[in-house]
Amino acid sequence: MAMTLLEDWCRGMDVNSQRALLVWGIPVNCDEAEIEETLQAAMPQVHYRVLGRMFWREENAKAALLELTGTVDYAAIPREMPGKGGVWKVVFKPPTSDAEFLERLHLFLAREGWTVQDVARVLGFENSSPAPGPDMPAEMLNYILDNVIKPLIESIWYKKLTLFSGRDIPGPGEETFEPWLEHANEVIEEWQVSDIEKRRRLMESLRGPAADVIRILKTNNPDITTAECLKALEQVFGSVESSRDVQVRFLNTYQNPGEKLSAYVIRLEPLLQKVVEKGAIDKENVNQARLEQVIAGANHSGAIRRQLWLTGAAEGPAPNLFQLLVQIREEEAKEEEAAAEAALLQLGLEGHF
């Protein structure tokens, strides 16, 4: 679970997960200065910077993400460190050695009934090469990985798009346009292949009128990019809301009864991005616009709303989406903890009487 959090957090912040540490088990009431003091005492030889902190609900404690900024001696990084409230745990991903890489490579290919030579032959490498072993130079291992194994895996096993036809009534397995486009943007960003291959995979998901649109465009412009294809589909099949309509919808989206404020922020974000796309809000003002609307729309989170109002009134830039969610989740955790304590106290009083 901790390793998954480390990888997801790093991916969300565009940080190399092998150059990062996750420190968790930090008490909720531990402030920034106390965290920094503990880290410095436990890792005096390690150069790092703290990227962020969050409340980890499953552990009922805070977690901190650190980026390693210098030459790293992984032997100097402790797996645990003494801190406020007990022992803090440390999770990281040291670089894989050549021997470990080879072992994993052979295991993977063996499960599929392949050898490295088989893969090289299929991909057009006619010259036979010796089976890789621990003595093979790292440059050759990297070449095999980048030019043989990764392309094979990516070409055979990749996440496919859902189907879209553009028909008024979607057929079996087909999506309407807005959900399809959102899913397509997410998946296409994950594909580590050329734009030509991305366009081919995009065409795989299209049926009927939608496929006809892209075929016509491709006939007129054989070099059309995947992004241009998506833009064309949006112009043909997307909503025709004006920038004013989108902005009004954004400003009239409020927190629902029983909805956590963090969930409201996540629900609000696609609308905000659409407002930006329509040009109603400048990209430079996105964080401020988000904060103002969250404060205005937080109908059912009074205490957190007051904290956010103080954040907005303070000098300095408004928090970005990630920082805002971290702040809100920490406040939600405090409220839940206070509510649980109040419930226990009430049970105790009822039992006494």
UniProtKB/Swiss-Prot annotation:
It comes from the Eukaryota. Its main location: nucleus. The lineage of its organism: Eukaryota, Metazoa, Chordata, Craniata, Vertebrata. This is Paraneoplastic antigen Ma1 homolog. One of its GO terms (biological process) is inflammatory response to antigenic stimulus. Keywords: Nucleus. The gene is PNMA1. Belongs to the PNMA family. GO terms for cellular component: cytoplasm; nucleolus. It is found in: Nucleus, Nucleolus.
